[in-house]
Amino acid sequence: MRTGVYPGTFDPITLGHMDIIRRATHLVDRLVIGVTTNPSKSPMFSVEERLAMVEREMAAITDCGSAEIRVVSFDSLLMDFAEREGASMIVRGLRAVADFEYEFQMAGMNQQLNDEIETVFLMAGVSLQPIASKLVKEIALYGGDIGKFVTAAVETDVRARVALIGRKGA
């Protein structure tokens, strides 16, 4: 059984993430979506909220072939997590050259930690390349329309959170 791990903060999960997930399921028999924390990011949602959001989106996803999809949280080195899950590959999405430079460096470091787990890069679909969770949050905080970047359910989650924390520039 080929297992892949797709790690991310998913704060929030975007249509770009969903595109990578759909396509990754055709490369593996089992895809483990790892929701994690990133010390360099300021999340809008807790790990538990993001986990629930991703699980909900995965329950609604179609066209994933026959791959089993599992959503879990983790708070460890990615390679340790991948080993625990029995993964043979790490799936990473790329939007632009800047993503590649960072991801290339991370893949090299990860290979030093475990050279039996490959990193596979999937290019985001052309129409999805500009989408980034950080930008989705920023647009929402200024009252902009995020409906082109996330599902309706995620948009509702983000709007509710913005209502709690307050809009910028209002």
Tell me the role of every PLM-derived stretch:
Residues 1-170:
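Nucleotidyltransferase catalytic core that binds NTPs
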